[in-house]
A protein has these predicted regions:
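Accessory RNA 3′-end/elbow-binding domains used by RNA modification enzymes
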Residues: 1-11, 17-38, 42-45, 63, ...
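The conserved catalytic core of RNA pseudouridine synthases
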Residues: 23-29, 43, 47, 136-169, ...
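Active-site phosphate-binding and catalytic loops of NTP-dependent enzymes
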Residues: 29-35, 109-116
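Short, charged/polar surface micro-motifs in flexible loops or helix N-caps
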Residues: 51-54, 76
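Structural signature of FAD isoalloxazine-binding scaffolds in flavoprotein oxidoreductases
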Residues: 58-73, 137-151
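Acidic, low-complexity central loop/insert segments
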Residues: 59-111
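Extended alpha-helical targeting/anchoring segments
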Residues: 118, 122-146
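Pseudouridine synthase
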Residues: 119, 126, 131, 158-203
Length: 289
């Protein structure tokens, strides 16, 4: 049984759904799902669960993301990125000092209004489709967490590289647009690269072509991060040998461990356990065939 998480290096001009289709074909299974959409024109880390690893989705999808984004001042667009129609222009020049001074106001908990051109849905319809039809929707502003935000390079006149670590659901193009508003200069996101999604990082990412080459060499299993490693952020809890069968059958075992999720072991990794009121039960079965 082939299972685990593969970290795909998604190129620009390819949708996250297209990556899933390719991964299904390469690993020859329909049990595939990605851990967070990347816009088609964005690039970078796209973790994809394969086989039984899809059971870990709820425990991995909320992890922090890290991005490198190029912010361009002097023009805003209707999509807040370089693919949209220009909405406003300005000849104003933004300096490094001006940008650095405003960035701290965008760290911590901030409120974002998701762009109309997005994968979010309203009444079962994507905001993107509603935007194309020219329809308005109620304000869907929400809080997100910006853990860190800094300028890492100046790329030219009115163009800077930002590094952002943030919570799930943060729109970097909206962040770029809002930074422009704060400085009184229209801005948009010119390019986006996701460098990390939780524990899944750029240096462990493989292109679809590289995955296909590994398959041809009979080395496809090398491309997968195991379910055990993917759950390594959880504390470990070991059961005695006589509790193995009861645990596998869903029966609870008494424990002094604090309430919360854990990696449950009985010699081998069994899966994700849940401790509650002095008992632990196997919540996500990841052992055996």
């Amino acid at each position: 049984m082939i299972e685990g998480i593969v970290t795909v290096l998604k190129p620009p001009a390819m949708s996250s759904s297209d990556v899933v289709v390719d991964v299904r074909h390469i690993y020859e299974t329909r049990r595939v799902g990605h851990l967070g959409t990347l816009d088609p024109e964005a690039a970078g880390v796209l973790p994809v669960c394969v086989g039984r690893a899809v059971r870990l989705f709820d425990y991995l999808v909320d992890k922090q993301k890290t991005y490198l984004a190029e912010i361009a001042f002097g023009a805003s667009t209707d999509t807040q990125d370089a693919q949209g129609k220009v909405a406003e222009t300005s000849d104003a020049v933004v300096t490094e000092e001006q940008l650095d001074a405003v960035l701290p106001s965008f760290t911590g908990t901030i409120v974002q209004r998701p762009p109309m051109y997005s994968a979010l849905k309203f009444n079962g319809q994507k905001l993107y489709d509603l935007a194309l039809k020219g329809k308005e929707i109620p304000d869907k502003s929400r809080e997100v967490q910006i853990v860190s935000l800094k300028r890492t390079a100046t790329l030219g006149r009115n163009r800077f590289l930002l590094e952002i670590t943030c919570s799930r659901g943060t729109y970097i193009r909206t962040l770029c647009s809002d930074i422009g508003e704060a400085l009184g200069v229209p801005a948009h996101m010119a390019f986006l690269l996701r460098t990390a999604s939780g524990m899944f990082t750029l240096d462990r990412s493989l292109t679809v072509a590289e995955l296909e080459a590994k398959k041809a060499e009979g080395r496809l299993s090398e491309t997968l991060i195991s379910c055990e490693e993917a759950a390594s952020f959880l504390p470990r809890l070991d059961l005695k040998a006589d509790r193995r069968k009861p645990a596998m059958n869903g029966l609870p075992t008494r424990t002094n461990a604090p309430d919360g999720l854990c990696r449950l072991y009985c010699d081998d990794f069994l899966g994700v356990g849940a401790v509650q009121h002095g008992s632990v039960s196997l919540k996500v079965h990841l052992y055996g065939e």
